[in-house]
Amino acid sequence: MTFNDKLQAYIQLTRFDKPVGIELLLWPTLWGVLFAAMGQAQQQGEGVTAGLPSLSIFVVFALGAILMRAAGCAINDFADRKVDGHVSRTKGRPLADGRLSAKEAIAAFLVLVLLSASLLLFLPIQVFYWSFAAVILAFIYPFMKRYTHLPQVFLAAAFGWAIPMAYVAIQGAADIWCWLLFLAYMCWTVAYDTQYAMADRDDDVKIGVKSTAILFGRYDVIIISLLQILFLVIMGAVMWHYFVPTSLGITPVFGLALVAMMFAKQNSACASRNALACFQAFLANIWVGRYVFALIAIACVWTTFNG
């Protein structure tokens, strides 16, 4: 195998060729960074209603999200190396087709974790302690599909752990609004990863892999809808808390109406249970992440300069 072939295999292992997963982790991480900065500003005293994070914090958490997502993909392929070859969508992955070995996947995981850990040098020491949970969750998630029908919950916790880390980095502690944001993110992630699992459900049943799509059965779309409603309600409450003291009031909350329409379109597609339709619904969630980030970012910038 040539150097270019090996490099391409590593790129596929870490999914740098498929940025959808990066965005699904990146945008919510930045939601946390922005809200934590708002909270810190509001804690400073009367008359201060908004604030923005420092550029360094913003960059560190963005890079951390990208690197830890890649690490998660590497350990996921290591865990699934014996089953990916039996699933039509994953049989071309580099461990499944033999282009990379299990040792090379573990090495890639460790290198990416170490690179992520190096970013902690730019953050308060408390964040270092919180990072242990992030690594543990990222490592154990891929193995959960063998033992429980709720691997999507572990994925959501692993991906969402950057939110409390952002609050600890900026505010010094994870407050109730941090955990509500984390819960909202958990609901959204379990919903979209169930859509993803619906695309593989037939193959997963054959090879004995567990998922929420299998657990929910014919109630899958209903439960996804309920999770999405919970996301909207909790996110609306978080936005209410941060923006009501500002000149925008509850205006940003109304912006979630577009997200509700996005969710409705996704569920309409998933109702057919067609694998491609479910996968396309999953992919559509990058626009949810982008839009909610834009909504929060614009509101934070506006209120920082206009009160």
Swiss-Prot record:
It comes from the Bacteria. Its EC number is 2.5.1.39. It is a multi-pass membrane protein. GO terms for cellular component: plasma membrane. One of its GO terms (biological process) is ubiquinone biosynthetic process. One of its GO terms (molecular function) is 4-hydroxybenzoate polyprenyltransferase activity. Pathway: Cofactor biosynthesis; ubiquinone biosynthesis. Its main location: membrane. Keywords: Cell inner membrane, Cell membrane, Magnesium, Membrane, Transferase, Transmembrane, Transmembrane helix, Ubiquinone biosynthesis. Belongs to the UbiA prenyltransferase family. Catalyzes the prenylation of para-hydroxybenzoate (PHB) with an all-trans polyprenyl group. Mediates the second step in the final reaction sequence of ubiquinone-8 (UQ-8) biosynthesis, which is the condensation of the polyisoprenoid side chain with PHB, generating the first membrane-bound Q intermediate 3-octaprenyl-4-hydroxybenzoate. This is 4-hydroxybenzoate octaprenyltransferase. The gene is ubiA.
